[in-house]
């Protein structure tokens, strides 16, 4: 049986889904109403949790993220003159977050899609 999937939207989620399906041999097409330049102009969040980092690596689209992203193992809270550091890595069994902009994630996924010859319209 041959499976084909249509994905609506070429944002990070749609592009990541398309890439993961492609790597499993599942044909897919991404349908986006806006131009690639418009999609890349949408500036949004830029903190990636561990699961998202892992998925980007699994999708073979995490190389630049690993080079350029800023890993954070914790953060500080300040209240009434007292500062407490929250050690995310220690409290979560080694998980971290990474600062790497959504626009950069989208660029990486678009590049991987273009390199593979997969179709987006």
Predicted regions, residues:
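Beta1/beta-strand and adjacent pyrophosphate-binding region of the FAD-binding site
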Residues: 1-13
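A secondary-structure boundary/capping signal
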Residues: 8-11, 32, 101
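Glycine-centered short loops/turns at secondary-structure junctions
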Residues: 9, 25-27, 117
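Glycine-rich FAD pyrophosphate-binding loop
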Residues: 22-43
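Active-site-adjacent segment of FAD-dependent monooxygenases/related oxidoreductases
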Residues: 40-44, 49-116
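General small-molecule cofactor/ligand-binding pocket signal
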Residues: 121
């Amino acid at each position: 049986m041959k499976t084909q999937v249509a994905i609506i939207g070429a944002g990070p989620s749609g592009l990541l889904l398309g890439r993961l399906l492609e790597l499993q041999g599942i044909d897919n097409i991404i349908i986006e109403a806006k131009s690639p330049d418009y999609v890349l102009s949408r500036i949004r969040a830029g903190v990636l949790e561990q699961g998202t980092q892992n998925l980007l690596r699994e999708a073979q689209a995490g190389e630049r993220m690993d080079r350029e992203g800023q890993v954070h193992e914790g953060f500080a809270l300040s209240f009434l003159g007292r500062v407490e550091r929250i050690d995310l890595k220690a409290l979560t069994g080694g998980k971290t977050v990474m600062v790497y902009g959504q626009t950069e994630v989208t660029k990486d996924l678009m590049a991987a899609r273009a390199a593979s010859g997969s179709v987006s319209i």
